[in-house]
Amino acid sequence: MIFSKISQVAHYVPQQLVTNNDLASIMDTSHEWIFSRTGIAERHISRDEMTSDLAIQVADQLLTQSGLKADAIDFIIVATISPDATMPSTAAKVQAAIAATSAFAFDMTAACSGFVFALAMADKLIASGAYQNGMVIGAETLSKLVNWQDRATAVLFGDGAGGVLLEASKDKHVLAETLHTDGARCQSLISGETSLSSPYSIGKKAIATIQMDGRAIFDFAIRDVSKSILTLMAQSDITKDDIDYCLLHQANRRILDKIARKIDVPREKFLENMMRYGNTSAASIPILLSEAVQKGQIRLDGTQKILLSGFGGGLTWGSLIVRI
């Protein structure tokens, strides 16, 4: 049988740094108010780089680190809710920029679960035997979706990108998987609506910026995500003691605190970086993974079991247990 493994990781964030104090100068908020509720102290905001620019930086790093030629890449998946345009896809721009002429490329839209969903799909593509090498990148410029007059949401989000290179392997590395969607609760977190605009249309005004029912999302993350992780471990016969690190979507420190207690995993196993990047949606998990590799916490030698878990708009949530 053929399996997939993560062989390389990379991340990139825009240079512009915006602190909580910077935000306090343009809206009614403070560092203390933001940090005490979210654990976020600063975030990176793009001045002129588009989502594809961030993703291209990551793709270039992955190629350089791997030593592969661009034409060895079979597919590129970019998870994003903030593409440059509806078409072409952000992934198509990445494919062109790195001259991966043999690769097919497409975007995945699953909000903050996007990287986990895309990684699960990429694993199946390689397991099919038809493809050997693929890139999975989460990239966002959420700053263009934020209502900068709404302090409840504007303080939460940042821009950035992270990704992995997947290669074929004779050994199984994706050990367990669970993916979920509940469209009945989709109105809890929305952005980027478009209006019907033909001469024959009568429609409501679209909501372009991020709108969130914070309490509903907070409760959803604690209840549904915790339950799915516990079910995943039980079904796969993997215990909490088997897990080396938990890399969850970086939405809010209090969410991580409560999930850690719910699944009874030591809090120190939960890596976090939301204090420096904010919520980067589909980019948050791969950025966290890349930083953990840089710090030597995760070794990429196939000896550690890592829980990856994303949750967000859709509503979507999903988890993978991966040997890295």
Swiss-Prot record:
Listed EC numbers: 2.3.1.180
Annotated compartments: Cytoplasm
Active-site residue numbers: C112, H249, N279
Top-level EC class: transferase
Cystine residue pairs: none
Keywords: Acyltransferase, Cytoplasm, Fatty acid biosynthesis, Fatty acid metabolism, Lipid biosynthesis, Lipid metabolism, Multifunctional enzyme, Transferase
Catalysed reaction equations from the record: malonyl-[ACP] + acetyl-CoA + H(+) = 3-oxobutanoyl-[ACP] + CO2 + CoA
InterPro entries: ACP_syn_III_C (IPR013747), ACP_syn_III_N (IPR013751), FabH (IPR004655), Thiolase-like (IPR016039)
GO molecular function, one term: 3-oxoacyl-[acyl-carrier-protein] synthase activity
Transmembrane feature ranges: none
GO biological process, one term: fatty acid biosynthetic process
Predominant subcellular localization, coarse grouping: cytoplasm
Any Gene Ontology CC annotation: cytoplasm
Residue span of region ACP-binding: 250-254
Pathway: Lipid metabolism; fatty acid biosynthesis
Function of the protein: Catalyzes the condensation reaction of fatty acid synthesis by the addition to an acyl acceptor of two carbons from malonyl-ACP. Catalyzes the first condensation reaction which initiates fatty acid synthesis and may therefore play a role in governing the total rate of fatty acid production. Possesses both acetoacetyl-ACP synthase and acetyl transacylase activities. Its substrate specificity determines the biosynthesis of branched-chain and/or straight-chain of fatty acids.
Domain notes: The last Arg residue of the ACP-binding site is essential for the weak association between ACP/AcpP and FabH.
Assembly and interaction partners: Homodimer.
Protein family: Belongs to the thiolase-like superfamily. FabH family.
Full protein name: Beta-ketoacyl-[acyl-carrier-protein] synthase III
Protein species of origin: Streptococcus pyogenes serotype M1
Lineage of origin: Bacteria, Bacillati, Bacillota, Bacilli, Lactobacillales
